[in-house]
């Protein structure tokens, strides 16, 4: 009776370790226990047999930290002998859970690893064939490199090849320079000889007669005055260096004539005659 009570208690505590039907005193490892799943023999050590209790099942020395086996199934992975058919561990499988490995070992077949390329930078490769981390290169990079030589061999622009015909205007940098005809220069020189500063009315008349714009006439007078100042400065510098008569392009000018040539007196002032002032002294 004492032995039957122990059997009932131990059967409730360890449902997966009941005695085999043969009564040989060994733990049920072939699935003959009370609904428990078989446990690997490599994880447990055999317990010594006790002759004091007849029919007492031999309990394996289980780790106290592991939960008892019951209807929950085995928490252990398959034996290592089953892993020999699969390839070795890879850096890409570092984050795969153990439960997924044990539940579906057929997912890790050799064909999945054969198509993977080298993994670069320690990143996990893609699960699809031929999409490894090392082969992630932008597709348009090769096209850009191939198109760069063709860009360098481009022909010059059309306006660079054609010969520009002169139509009265030439281009210097970003501004247009007007090319005046001989008739236009002659009329402008006549007007400049009379008046160095042209009036607004006369400027509009010259623009209409010569076929120019008022802005072009104004710019011509500005340039002509600047040219005259430059010529006068050049003559003065030549006179100071030589110490004698100043030689010009047209004629020679003596030193006594310089004031008359540089500074002309108006015609109205020339008509006046000097007035003689007589002093009258009144005596007492």
UniProtKB/Swiss-Prot annotation:
Gene: CDX4
Comp. bias regions, Polar residues: 238-253
Single GO MF descriptor: sequence-specific double-stranded DNA binding
Transmembrane segments: none
InterPro entries for the chain: Caudal_activation_dom (IPR006820), Caudal_homeobox (IPR047152), HD (IPR001356), HD_metazoa (IPR020479), Homeobox_CS (IPR017970), Homeodomain-like_sf (IPR009057), HTH_motif (IPR000047)
Family label: Belongs to the Caudal homeobox family.
Residue spans of biased composition, Gly residues class: 22-37
Gene3D superfamilies recorded: Homeodomain-like (1.10.10.60)
SMART domains per record: HOX (SM00389)
Descriptive protein name: Homeobox protein CDX-4
Taxon lineage: Eukaryota, Metazoa, Chordata, Craniata, Vertebrata
Tagged with keyword NADP: no
GO cellular-component term (any): nucleus
Residues covered by region (Disordered): 15-40, 120-155, 238-259
Swiss-Prot/TrEMBL keywords: Developmental protein, DNA-binding, Homeobox, Nucleus, Transcription, Transcription regulation
SUPFAM superfamilies tied to this protein: Homeodomain-like (SSF46689)
One GO term of the biological process aspect: negative regulation of transcription by RNA polymerase II
